[in-house]
């Protein structure tokens, strides 16, 4: 059961990334940085996370762990009116997306529930590393 839950969580993360990128007509090559926050980022090996298809196959230098960002943000808002103003400004510029209502999301999710994915072409560096290990 734990493995099933992990695979579903990994699939949800990757399919959410793909769905959001697709909604903007972006692809993974356009990602400059990925900020990983919270408990998942503190102990994760990013190379392994990419290898299993949790995150896109992009250079590891683009991934940044930023800690407990919600707690830090709340703390800064309490201490600084400038930070509070910036927080509201950022929030007003965000777009909410209900992934379950996006027609392609479930297809993305199902494909992402395989390791690394049913479309291994999205993971060229991972596949090359696997070939080199043989």
Predicted regions and their residues:
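Helical "lid/coupling" subdomains associated with nucleotide-phosphate turnover
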Residues: 1-134
